Design a protein with these regions (language model features):
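N-terminal amphipathic/basic-hydrophobic helices that include classical n-h-c signal peptides
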Residues: 1-16
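Active-site-adjacent structural elements in enzyme catalytic cores
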Residues: 14-219
Length: 219
């Protein structure tokens, strides 16, 4: 990795690389490399329990903007989600969770779900929708969970641009297409082809917005 300085005097780490991380036993040294990259405002591509996604520190505004440029979307209209390490972490970024909702979240997480919840004041404005909501995830993926826990901040979760999802199951294909656009591409084995199931929990009853990889039975 090469360290340099920006025009404003801040430092950055040039950590552009293709990094293999074992899906069941993530190597601490490689996790540390990813964490250092995120701390310095880097953008990564990482595995989840569904499809591979773009990620960065949610508190690094320029990194979030960079991901939006890669996806060619307006940051204020992108409806981006982010990954938390556990329910305790998730509760910091949403308003008070009542017992029924907590039980619901606990029964489905970790898992291939994105829950739309009312955002707390800790959520950066760039990530909030006009309705003051945010999509939150806790993927059932060891690499993703380890990165978020070691990093200490939530990780932005954004799908890769384009409609050819089958191309994004192979990390090598991802590298061929995106290596010049991001800082680290993590090879955590083959990815999935189906995105997460999205459920809106901002009303009294949960509402299914998108059926994805996670099973869901509406009451």
């Amino acid at each position: 990795m090469l360290k340099g300085s920006n025009q404003d005097g801040s430092f950055y780490i040039d950590c552009r690389m293709y990094l293999y991380i074992h899906p069941d036993n993530p190597q601490p040294r490689n996790i540390k490399t990813v964490v250092e990259c995120l701390q310095d405002g880097g953008v990564i591509i990482y595995p989840t329990d569904t499809i591979y996604g773009l990620g960065c520190d949610i508190f690094k505004y320029k990194a979030v903007e960079r991901i939006c440029r890669i996806k060619n979307v307006d940051p204020l209209k992108a409806q981006l989600s982010f990954v938390c390490s556990d329910l305790s972490d998730l509760s910091k970024y949403t308003r008070s969770i009542g017992t029924p909702l907590y039980r619901l979240l606990k029964s489905y997480l970790p898992g291939p779900y994105t829950f739309i919840l009312t955002a707390s004041k800790l959520v950066p404005k760039i990530l909030k929708s006009k309705k003051n909501t945010i999509g939150l995830r806790i993927p059932d993926n060891k690499i993703c969970q380890t990165i978020v826990k070691e990093f200490g901040n939530p990780l932005l979760s954004a799908s890769l641009p384009g409609e050819m999802v089958e191309e994004y199951t192979d990390p090598e294909s991802i590298k061929d297409k995106f290596s010049a656009l991001v800082d680290i591409i993590i090879d955590g084995g083959p990815g999935g082809m189906v995105a997460s199931t999205v459920v809106d929990c901002t009303s009294e009853e949960p509402v299914l917005l998108r059926m994805g990889a996670g099973a869901w039975e509406e009451s």
